[in-house]
Amino acid sequence: MLKTLVTDVDGTITDRRRRINTAAVETIRTLVDAGIEVVLASGNTVCFMDGLCKMVGTDGTIIGENGGVYRRGFSGTLRIPGDQEVCREAFKVLNDYFAGKGVELELYSAQYRFADVAFARNIDPDEARAIIRDHGLPVRVLDTGFAIHLQTPGVSKGTALVELAREMGLSPSEMMAVGDSENDIEMLEAAGIGVAVRNAPVRTLSAADWVSEEGYGDGFVEAVKKYYPYLFSR
């Protein structure tokens, strides 16, 4: 039996223009009102996630910065498995390299991040990976489709899901995860049921146990409708 739903935000409970899908929000509220814990998981910052949790109506249990941080409830201890120092070092290397080519890297929410470094998608992530590799830095370059993130290897939404499940007294097999991007793959694989919405890339679709017919927030609603009667029973 599934007891908790973990969902990505951008591209999963939004529309293609990153506007929140109101049907997805109503679905989340229905789950919360039924006593099912809903965890929001994103590459975004803790402060962004806190505001979203308040407005949507969840209890503040989050996975942020692509697994670099996670927390049980608004009053819980913020866990930070990511190592931001090495990510900052990697960003400096990239910034110096691309500045030499006349390209400026625009940081995203740097003052609000605890574990990773995020910046605009105006460079080729494969080129960034090659530069990081040439400098021997232990940093993962992650392209979420919304930003490029520099992250500690071995840290992902999937590892955060496993650790969060332990704090909640659950097994990862008792969690359902929904996502749309390559940064959701580990999360879908770690959960008992992993669902990809139709707009996901091929690698993410292949990692999922089930794929919705609809994309974006409508696909999220479809997924919950499919699994709710059978798996979220009490």
Swiss-Prot record:
Q: What class of enzyme is it?
A: hydrolase
Function comment? Catalyzes the dephosphorylation of 2-phosphoglycolate.
What is the name listed in the Swiss-Prot or TrEMBL entry for this protein? Answer: Phosphoglycolate phosphatase
Q: Output the InterPro entries linked to this UniProt entry.
A: HAD-like_sf (IPR036412), HAD-SF_hydro_IIB (IPR006379), HAD_sf (IPR023214), PGPase (IPR006382)
Tell me one Pfam family matched here: Hydrolase_3
Keywords (alphabetical) are: Carbohydrate metabolism, Hydrolase, Magnesium, Metal-binding
Is Magnesium among the key words of this record?
Answer: yes
Please tell me where substrate binds in this chain. 157
Q: Which residues bind Mg(2+)?
A: 8, 10, 180, 184
Q: Which PANTHER family match?
A: HAD SUPERFAMILY HYDROLASE-LIKE, TYPE 3 (PTHR10000:SF8), PHOSPHOSERINE PHOSPHATASE (PTHR10000)
HAMAP family hit by this protein? GPH_hydrolase_arch
- Provide the cofactor list for this protein: Mg(2+)
To which protein family does this belong?
A: Belongs to the archaeal SPP-like hydrolase family.
Catalytic reaction annotation: 2-phosphoglycolate + H2O = glycolate + phosphate
- Cite the EC number: 3.1.3.18
**Can you quote a single GO CC term?**
cytosol
Catalytic residues in the record: 8 (nucleophile)
Q: One MF term in GO for this entry?
A: magnesium ion binding
